[in-house]
Amino acid sequence: MLIVKRFILWVLLFFMAITQLLLYLPDFSCSISTGLPLCTPQFNVNIVTGSRTTKDFVSSVRQFLRLISYLAIDMGWSKYLADPHIYNEENLVDTFDTDNLFKINYFGFCKKTSGKTKYCVANGDCGMDVLGILVRDVGLQLGRLTQRYENNTRILGDSLVFTYHLGLSSMRKFLRNDNYRNNAFSKLLLATDDQPYSNTRIKNYAKGVTVAYTLVVVNKIMFYMHLAEITISAAFVVAVLGFGFVLIFGKHHTIMPLLLKGWGSVLMVSSTSSYLATIVYLGTLKLLEPTEMLDTQSQVAGHVLNNDTHSNNWDLLQTTVGSGFVISCFRYIVQCLMLPLVFIAANRYTKAKDFLPAGTEELIKV
């Protein structure tokens, strides 16, 4: 009976520890298409063209993707070369179509079109980098068009992502160095008859490159932070199990309660950092959304949207919170409630002399 009472608090702690660990499982969804392709995304993203800059950009990218799709077919890369329907619009690379929905998680993403999931794939250590995901989607679709990579489309997807990262780094260095030359080369590439508008375009494209590069770096950091958090969570469960094992041999201990408090504190710091980083990242993606209120006010006031300063922003994405983020919030609440229980259990089963100041034990004996 005494042993049963001893384990009541530990059972509650173990239940909460296992619960918070199991709540990490949805983070691994959205990464495979085989079997049952479950997906509980942190957020959902679709392409929008809310400004003149993004309209020009998306239109140019669509034309380029159409060109390389035709190129892949005409050069005999496609096994469907004899099929005349291969040239239909729905068979070409459609990454930047506005009816696509990308469901993004920590370790992978799913692409959904017209309400149907087309595929789910792992995203490596790129994490939730939205622009990198769009590049990977281009590679995956080209891989399906080409006969050489039809059985392993990820090869071309990985290659394009690697090329994208290299190109982004090179473009960032180019724009940074060109800034010291008064944007001489940038003006040659992006110049128009309207010189003030040309300078604005240069600044906007430089801003776009900076945002894209920042997304790459931040998401790599967030990926490894989250991986470390899951590892710490598993280690904490092991510590709880070890704590329960030593309780069999006695009620009061020294080392295991300290380990329990240590792992619990580290887990809380790690989960808080990861949780806040995800919130900040979602907030950053919200900045890439079009501000419909400003657009409406401009139209009501009789202004032409193309002449508005807001129309030059990178309003490229529309982001909504996914079910995976809701699960993450619930997991974080469980961890916050679990931390006080960790310290209560550890202090309850710690040897009494560990709490006494030096010399107190001798006074008690006297």
UniProtKB/Swiss-Prot annotation:
One of its GO terms (cellular component) is cytoplasm. Its main location: membrane. Disulfide bonds: none annotated. GO terms for biological process: spore membrane bending pathway. It is found in: Prospore membrane. Keywords: Membrane, Sporulation, Transmembrane, Transmembrane helix. The chain crosses the membrane at residues 7-27, 230-250, 262-282, 325-345. Residues 1-6, 251-261, 346-366 are cytoplasmic. Residues 28-229, 283-324 are lumenal. It is a multi-pass membrane protein. Involved in spore and ascus formation. Required for the efficient assembly of the precursors of the prospore membrane to a continuous prospore membrane. Belongs to the SMA2 family. This is Spore membrane assembly protein 2. The gene is SMA2.
